Design a protein with these regions (language model features):
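Cross-family detector of peptidyl-prolyl cis-trans isomerase
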Residues: 1-131
């Protein structure tokens, strides 16, 4: 499924649901903190990274706040279109990944393939509208 970013109609990712959607569960907001298990590959299948060895918040869990500037736009878009408990495969075009930058084995203009499982939303913050 093509998922288009509401903030930029030219920005998109491709998502394939593996397990889900768990529609009775929450969907994170842009300010939520999420717990995700992931495997990252280049589009050609070359393994790049995984949350497997992260132990800080539980076995293999990567915790992040979705409005963190350190996250790529495609990750944020994918996770905000998942329910807690969902597993998806996501193709992220280079424009929503690292763009023209390189990072380790990720070369400029690289599309990325993530396998994501949204394990939990430990902090479901609501947007602060100046209150």
């Amino acid at each position: 499924t093509k998922v288009v970013a509401p903030w930029d109609v030219s920005a998109y990712i491709l998502m394939h649901t593996i397990d889900g959607p768990h529609t009775d569960n929450l969907v994170p907001l842009s300010t939520s903190t999420t717990d995700v298990r992931y495997h990252l590959h280049l589009y050609d299948g070359t393994p790049v990274d995984s949350s497997t060895n992260i132990k800080t918040y539980g076995d293999g869990i990567f915790r992040s706040r979705l409005n963190d500037d350190g996250l790529i736009a495609g990750w944020k878009l994918a996770v905000q279109n998942m329910h807690a408990g969902d597993s998806v495969e996501v193709i992220i075009p280079y424009t929503q990944a690292y763009g023209t930058q390189s990072l380790g084995v990720i070369k400029p203009y690289s599309a990325l393939r993530f396998n994501l499982r949204l394990v939990d939303i430990p902090f479901y913050e609501l947007p602060n509208y100046g209150n």
